[in-house]
């Protein structure tokens, strides 16, 4: 479960986003069916006009955010050391780096950062490019990426997506969320993180299981949400845009270390006195 670093990746991020013109082909990739429940996806849209009257925002959210920043100041969570922004080869050409970012995101689903990082290292040792993956047989690819979660499905999705990138985008990755989510094995969270890390563009909040869980526990959504995409829409309705990039990185690490899915460490949490759900645990 990877996340982006909060400040856009510095020099590497600028290199990644540098070669945008001329590297994309506007043709849309074909849709592939998925077994998971579909939730409507809102793409990058024009800013909504401000509605009259006070805007809803959660109680104590700014104080909670500052305390989470304090708890994350050491940057020693798995996401800080082995997140997606640490998985690609910073010395590779920008187009290759963007492809590696996308592959690391595809591998990260339902997989711990340590496992994703190790799989990416093994792939990079063989020269990870669009052409090298297309030339690799499925059995070999499976052996390399194992034991990432659902590795058999990911072999299929990686091969299908890589072929589309070669045919439709000249070996690069799409530059919009709408095009990215049409690729096999790429969901909204991956698309927004790809825009952030690969293109250095903030298109929306990347909501994974940690962000979804923590924002519901803190009541940062007006009403409880069941799916990450619902959570993203609810958060983007009130959270200032200049926090969209940082919030994923903050909450993923916080969820890995303190606000755990089971038996959260509430006694160690600086927000225990102002967390709406702390008393449940």
Swiss-Prot record:
The gene is NTHL1. Residues 168-192 form the HhH domain. The keyword Chaperone does not apply. The lineage of its organism: Eukaryota, Metazoa, Chordata, Craniata, Vertebrata. It comes from Gallus gallus (Chicken). It catalyses: 2'-deoxyribonucleotide-(2'-deoxyribose 5'-phosphate)-2'-deoxyribonucleotide-DNA = a 3'-end 2'-deoxyribonucleotide-(2,3-dehydro-2,3-deoxyribose 5'-phosphate)-DNA + a 5'-end 5'-phospho-2'-deoxyribonucleoside-DNA + H(+). Binds 1 [4Fe-4S] cluster. The cluster does not appear to play a role in catalysis, but is probably involved in the proper positioning of the enzyme along the DNA strand. Residues 1-60 are annotated as: Disordered. Its cofactor is [4Fe-4S] cluster. It is found in: Nucleus; Mitochondrion. Keywords: 4Fe-4S, DNA damage, DNA repair, Glycosidase, Hydrolase, Iron, Iron-sulfur, Lyase, Metal-binding, Mitochondrion, Nucleus, Transit peptide. The active site is at 189 (nucleophile). Residues 15-24 have a biased composition (Low complexity). Gene3D superfamilies: Helix-hairpin-Helix base-excision DNA repair enzymes (C-terminal) (1.10.1670.10), Hypothetical protein, domain 2 (1.10.340.30). InterPro entries: DNA_glycosylase, Endonuclease-III-like_CS2, Endouclease-III_FeS-bd_BS, HhH-GPD_domain, HhH_base_excis_C, HhH_motif, NTH1. This is Endonuclease III-like protein 1. The record marks 208 as: Important for catalytic activity. [4Fe-4S] cluster binds at residues 259, 266, 269, 275. One of its GO terms (cellular component) is nucleus. Belongs to the Nth/MutY family. GO terms for molecular function: 4 iron, 4 sulfur cluster binding; class I DNA-(apurinic or apyrimidinic site) endonuclease activity; DNA binding; DNA-(apurinic or apyrimidinic site) endonuclease activity; metal ion binding; oxidized pyrimidine nucleobase lesion DNA N-glycosylase activity. One of its GO terms (biological process) is nucleotide-excision repair. Bifunctional DNA N-glycosylase with associated apurinic/apyrimidinic (AP) lyase function that catalyzes the first step in base excision repair (BER), the primary repair pathway for the repair of oxidative DNA damage. The DNA N-glycosylase activity releases the damaged DNA base from DNA by cleaving the N-glycosidic bond, leaving an AP site. The AP lyase activity cleaves the phosphodiester bond 3' to the AP site by a beta-elimination. Primarily recognizes and repairs oxidative base damage of pyrimidines. The keyword Nucleotide-binding does not apply. SMART domains: ENDO3c. PANTHER family: ENDONUCLEASE III-LIKE PROTEIN 1 (PTHR43286:SF1).
